[in-house]
Each structure stands twice: as structure tokens, then as C-alpha cells.
Amino acid sequence: SPQLAASQVSKQYSYDGLTAVNFTAGNDGGGNVSIALANEAIPVDVQRQGNKLVVRLTGSTVPRNLLRRLNVNSGLVDSIDTKNQGQNGVITINVKEDYEYQAYQSGNQLNINIRKPELLREPTLEEKVYSGEALSMEFQDVEIRSVLDILAQFTDMNIVASDSVAGNITLRLINVPWDQALDIILKSKNLGKRENGNVILVVPSTELAEQEARELEAQQAVESY
């Protein structure tokens, strides 16, 4: 019937693109906003607008049960608003003072880290300090080996992947240091790395653990003589 056809059309162009929004406070007054998307292919745009960080879902909306203000009031982050503007869902992170941010999406999970500007903060003991140049890139179902090649070209490092590194990845990175980007990529695919000078060897984590165990055994055998 025409009514059925109309409802199918409206569903096709507007659907819920979000399943959860959560905030975790950080040690330095910042925090992490994690956004679970309905699927990894939903187009997402992240823009800084003064003391607001605006995340826009293009062509998909926020479901009714998530339309709300989340009063965080934790360090830098005051609140998080979720609403719809036409066919697009909009998540607005309201920040109290000057901030830096980086965002990365792995699979259907979008993570946005908000923190004090570098000059104003001391790294905590648990925090790994990344010093690589920041980059922004997006991959939709691209071979992991191709992504590592692109990263190697960006960094002038030699990134060598073992034969057993395979599979595809969907990933979005915004303003992320390249060495952190590499760690995010490796973690998402259960891969590990070994560094030697300007060469980074990438292997599956299980292989890396076995290799390190063998080396430790050999070292202990030598020491026991």
C-alpha cells in the first residue's frame, strides 16, 4: 500500500544511529566521552565551537530514550546534551574552560578524550605520553596492512608486518598523535609491536608473547650455566 511504502522510505532516510553515551572522568580534570554507534559506517563529524564540542551524526538520529542532558559536572566537562536537528542527531559536550581534544573511532565505538591544554597539565604516572605528530584519517573496511603502510609513510618509520597480520579495519582518527594511532590500531586487532631503532615489527599479540617467552627461556638457560 502507499502508506507502507511511505513508512519504508522514511525509515530508510532516518534511523537511530546511537545506542549509548557515557562519560568517564580522567585523573587530570578531563575525561572520556564514549559514544556507541548503531553501526560503524554511520558518518560522524566532530567540530570544536568555542567551549562546546559538537558531534553530528549525518542521516541518523538519537533515539528517544537518549534525548537528554547528562549533568556531568566533573572537572572540565559540565554537561552533555543529546538532541535531534531534523534527520541528524547532535551530541554537544559543554566544556567549562580551555581544552584540547582528540577523537578516534574503532568499530562502532567513538571515543572523545577531553583534557587541559598540554601547557597546563602534568602527565599522571599511569598515562602513557605520546609525542608523535597529530594526524586525522578515516578508513572504511580497509586492509590492516594498507593502513600500516600509510602510517609508515606519514611517520618516516619502517613498519614491518609479519605474514600472519591480516584482516580489514574501520577506523576514524581526529587529531591523534601517530604513535597513539598505531597503538589504537594494534589494540583493536589484537596485535603487538617490537621496536628496534626506526623499525617497528607488528605481529599478532599471541605470537609476540610466545616469542618473548622463548627469548626469556634462552636467557635463563644462559644465566644458569
State the predicted function of each range.
Residues 2-32, 38-225:
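Sec-dependent N-terminal signal peptides of Gram-negative outer-membrane/periplasmic proteins
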